[in-house]
Amino acid sequence: MQNSESIIKNIKNSSYLIDKEFLVWPENAFIGDKNIELIEKWNLKSYIKERKNFFSDDSVKKEYEEIHKKFNEEAISSYHVIISNLEEIYENCKRNKKIYYQDIMPTVKKVIEFYKKQKKIFIKYFRIPKLSANYHIIHSVNTAILTVALGNEMGLNNYKTVELCSIALLHKIGFLFIPSKISEKKEALTEEELEIIKKYPIISYKIASTSNLSRSICLTLLTHKENLDGTGYPKGLTSENISIESNIIGAASAYSAIILDKAYKKSFNSGASIIELIKDADKKFDKRVLKLIINAISSCPLDFIVELNDNSIAKIVDIDESNPNLPYINYIIKNGKVIDKNEQSSVQSIPNTNTGIKKILNQNEIELIKNKYSLIDII
């Protein structure tokens, strides 16, 4: 049996073809009236159409017991079962150097069922305790759930949704054969180590292509790290040679990475993660795909921190199903003073009043507020 170093060394960058397909997407993505300017530079303004939904969240970063009070016990169990199932799939692949479609189908089904049941709050489960699962496993599960959400926004048929979910679950499979001293390194990678990391899509492709996975799955595993401007890897392809499926997986993976805690990097909250994602959108991601992510994320309750019309800082905590454009907020800073958690009570945000939302805060703005008011965290 070949060891990891041998597998990497023997990889050859052979030529391959990329299939391209048209994408039909709904013209109703929504970020918020005061936040649209953040993505004007990517020429997305003409695509944004207001719809009746908003962002909310009940809790984030609570102690484990508190989280279980807020989150659905059955959903938490289902989420952890998906993680455990994918761990088993990855372990089998590491032993056998192969992966079979029928082996991942039960997990794909569970991911799709999880999304359908938690459609309005699925992002919240990305931030619950993950036990001791491997980062790449958790990242792949979260990417798969988000990919199913994107498929829902696109109105994809079941076959295509299953295919994209399968790719998302497997898109980090190549990391199994990257030496852990490199793949789990907390410090900055050397140039040589970075080049080894960049081979993981090729490893994934080689494993998939020697199994019974479809050509479309194999090629998307190979190219999901390619960027529109040619700065991606492993081949440095440009937009005309990158399939829409690859860009969907790449963008979903990027968002899932931003929102997920790492040993060496603190995660962003859900709202700040969107802003972080769109920073390099013109270089990396298809505008249509970015629009789908904005649409999917803004459709479910989130932990957005916002600035109000009176310059107060608040967190969106609930949504009125009968009037989704009027979310409920808890003040964090009001009249220049920190509001004690025990004194917080939810009020409804009304446009064109003091409680109206001016903008969503990015991570830098959140950090500035934390430092200014000596807050350990904003939750």
Swiss-Prot record:
Q: What class of enzyme is it?
A: hydrolase
Q: HD-GYP domain: from which residue to which, for each copy? A: 114-310
* Database matches in InterPro entries: HD/PDEase_dom (IPR003607), HD_GYP_dom (IPR037522)
* Required co-factors: Mn(2+)
Role: Phosphodiesterase (PDE) that catalyzes the hydrolysis of cyclic diguanylate (c-di-GMP) to GMP.
This protein is called: Cyclic di-GMP phosphodiesterase PdeB
Keywords, in A-Z order: c-di-GMP, Hydrolase
Write down the Pfam families for this protein, in alphabetical order: HD_5 (PF13487)
Q: What is its EC number?
A: 3.1.4.-
- Source domain of life is Bacteria
The reaction(s) annotated as catalysed by this protein in its Swiss-Prot or TrEMBL entry are: 3',3'-c-di-GMP + 2 H2O = 2 GMP + 2 H(+)
Disruption phenotype annotation: Mutant cells exhibit a significantly increased flex rate. Deletion does not significantly affect virulence in needle-inoculated mice, but mutants display a reduced ability to survive in ticks and they are unable to complete the mouse-tick-mouse infection cycle.
Which GO molecular function terms does the record list? hydrolase activity
Give yes or no: UniProt keyword Ion transport: no
